[in-house]
Amino acid sequence: MTLFSSISSLSSSMTSSRSIFASFGSGTIMGSNSISCTVGSGSCGSGSGGCGDLTGGAKSSGGSCGGKGGSHNHGHGHGPHGQGGKGSGGSCSC
């Protein structure tokens, strides 16, 4: 019984860490083990460090979480743990 509850707990924690959404204005991007990052209000990610590598997923650096500037700017952040979010305008630099 103890083993089952441990497996169940581990399974549910893995599932929750893989289903984090990253939404950008009108479009929504979902990536496994990616940090959520919302563009619009200037806030970026969650926890200290903004879009840090909290779940072992994507980690971006240098204008991460998409582009900075006008509506025609589409930025891609690439980090050591995979590809970061994709943004269209707004300011979301972590």
Swiss-Prot record:
Region (Disordered): 58-94
A Gene Ontology BP annotation from the UniProt entry: sorocarp development
Biased composition (Gly residues): 58-70, 80-94
Domain of life: Eukaryota
InterPro entries: HssA/B-related
Pfam families (UniProt xref): Coiled
Family: Belongs to the hssA/B family.
Protein name (Swiss-Prot/TrEMBL): HssA/B-like protein 53
Protein source organism: Dictyostelium discoideum (Social amoeba)
